[in-house]
Amino acid sequence: MSQVIRTLALTGLALAGLSGCVSVPRGQGGAAPAVVGQVSESARQAEAARQAWLQAHPAWSFQGRVAISKGRDGGSGRLDWQQDGPRYHVQLSAPVTRQSWVLTGDTTTGAGRLEGLDGGPRAGADAEQVLLEATGWTIPVNQMPDWVRALRIADAGAARVDLDEHGRPRTVQQDGWTIDFLEWTPASAAQPELPRRIEARNGDAKVRLLVDQWTLSP
């Protein structure tokens, strides 16, 4: 999960425009899962099955609310992420100001295009560089699809991952960030468990994501 939490920093595109637009409730789902020192073999197998299922279903989307703060600056908005294999289409909107930004790209090629900025769209062979030049944030968008589903990233380098009793990631510490998976959407006949509420912090930078709805293609 190398650096993935910074992906949500794309909301820094419009902290002023998003300020106060959408609330992201804290802890509305009850107590967060506890970190455990040992995980049962059945839990490990269940988590391995969850990840295998998600890897086999690369077309998915989620809608939710995101809030980001950096020191005294902060804002919130609605986030609509659509993924089809390596291709993604991400829309961030501020309902009150009616502002919106769209990021599209391909995790295979790394290219991306950002729309909704003053001065017109920006595009380039490196989506991360496009976002860096537009916002000042380093955002590894190619890792976001794995991270938001709490999938392990095999080639991401060393990371500390604490698990809950179900074998799922509970807290991840890497590259200065502490990422907490605080609530999960229960499994259904159509999909396995998926993260619902995630909070992260790195110094005075904080990000909160609340997923209202997951949709996965058969």
Curated annotation (Swiss-Prot):
Lipidation (S-diacylglycerol cysteine): C21
Membrane topology: Lipid-anchor
Predominant location: membrane
Cross-referenced Gene3D superfamilies: Lipoprotein localisation LolA/LolB/LppX
Residues in the signal sequence: 1-20
Top-level taxon of the source organism: Bacteria
One Gene Ontology cellular component annotation held by this UniProt entry: cell outer membrane
Keywords linked to the UniProt accession: Cell outer membrane, Chaperone, Lipoprotein, Membrane, Palmitate, Protein transport, Signal, Transport
SUPFAM superfamilies noted in UniProt: Prokaryotic lipoproteins and lipoprotein localization factors (SSF89392)
Membrane-spanning intervals of the chain: none
Location in or out of the cell: Cell outer membrane
Residues with a covalently attached lipid (N-palmitoyl cysteine): C21
HAMAP family per record: LolB (MF_00233)
Family: Belongs to the LolB family.
UniProt subunit comment: Monomer.
Main function: Plays a critical role in the incorporation of lipoproteins in the outer membrane after they are released by the LolA protein.
NCBIfam families: lolB (TIGR00548)
Protein name: Outer-membrane lipoprotein LolB
Species per Swiss-Prot/TrEMBL record: Xanthomonas campestris pv. campestris (strain B100)
